Amino acid sequence: MCATMENLPDCTQSVGRSSATSLQSNPQMDSITVFAQNYYGMTLILGIALLIFGGHLLVEGSVAIATRLGISKLVIGLTIVAFSTSSPELALNIIASMNGHSELCLGNIFGSNIANIGLVLGIGALICKLPVTGRIIKVEFPLLIFATLIVGVATLIGTLNAYWAIGFLCLFSFLMWTWFRIGNEDESQVAMQSEGAISEVQYSTIGAWAMLLTGLVLLALGGKATEIGAVTGALSLGMSEIVVGGTVVAIATSLPEVVTTIIAAKKGHPDLAVGNVVGSNIFNILFVLPITILVNPISISSDVWLYVVVMFVMTVLAWFLTMDSRIKPKEGGILVGLYIAFLAYVTFSIVT
């Protein structure tokens, strides 16, 4: 019998390992096990829904407050909107890291980056050609590749500690300074590109703050619910935390980007897709990951390597596909196909 919430994963794992024996001795155990798995499945779904909705409220409230304070759309687009795309991952990782679930955190970050390229860019390119600015090709993509390579080196060493976190945050700060400096040289163009991601709805000051605070609360609740559902559900099914974080949770937390890309493409703003994906992936590695590390240092297991390699290969491939300043539908099909192959390999590994 588990007395505390922290003991839930251990108890669930024990139930999962002994389920075959227990079913022979207790016919009622089958329905009990199914109910437990459904419960944690519903908890996972509820947690993800809270993360997505909480992130939406957070960005709506933040944008409204920033607008009322006279902050330009350029600054909003480069900071708040970029943060909003990674807020579900950040909320989940902080809570999961506090409870020692480091593999779930890494799976969430790496899996989200893989899904952003394979699903978001792939599906967006299948709908229409995605134009890519020269700045993304020459600055943001190489920086993303460099950051991904550094993460690979860190995983090879075996531990992600505070030194790595400080290094990532320094690089992120330099990138933010570069964004603002380059943005000021051509503010009108960047502001116009960011405009499609910023709501035009006007809210009162009280309403904006209410949305922001409600969003933060929902993110906290959603992060805890997702952690419980993912960890305990995975263990009951014999899956590792990194598999759940890198597939189920990663796909779910990337759904807002998928929907946004589809809507942007249909409304004639496909240029937002590549910039949003690259920005979100940079944010995940250079901000979400170091914050997670500062909460609790991460020890790397051998299972993490698959996700690091796939993330690096997908990132480099996407960069090469943008060399002619666009991603064509057939190239989008390649990205989606590779992502499906990745999921198939992970599924096959679980089964075997």
Residue map of PLM features:
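Hydrophobic alpha-helical segments, chiefly the membrane-spanning helices
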Residues: 2-19, 23-352
